Amino acid sequence: MDQISMFDLMYPTFKTNNPVRLIELFAGVGSQAMALRNLGVPFEHYLMSEWEMHATASYKAIHMADDDTDYSAEMSSEDVIQALTQLGISVDGKKPLTEEQIRSHSYSDAWRRECYNNIKATHNLVNICSMRGGDLAITNTDRYTYLMTYS
């Protein structure tokens, strides 16, 4: 006997034949991606926005563990500092670090490069306050289904 739930009656079934591109706003460690993975939904980690660097490091470790690319290899230490400042990274999830804080001895060059590499590996737009609609690069909507989540 088939079982039916009230959700079957309340919500229409959604199906797509197009590949799913996931955009996670306030991504944290990627719970939405984990849910899709656990449900067996094939998807692409397309973009995310998370400014808290510990969460970004966790996201990368969970979802992009095989990406050990050094995206900062061709950059000077100064270039990395400027990039992180411009992106508006945070370590407390409440306010962005200032250039002086990023530059300080509290954060080593290795830490700054790891942050930058994690951002690039996770396709992270970082600070949602500085994003615009075009930054989401939602194109080819006839070819892809874009799923945007926030938490």
Language-model regions: role of each:
Residues 1-151:
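Conserved active-site and SAM-binding loop architecture
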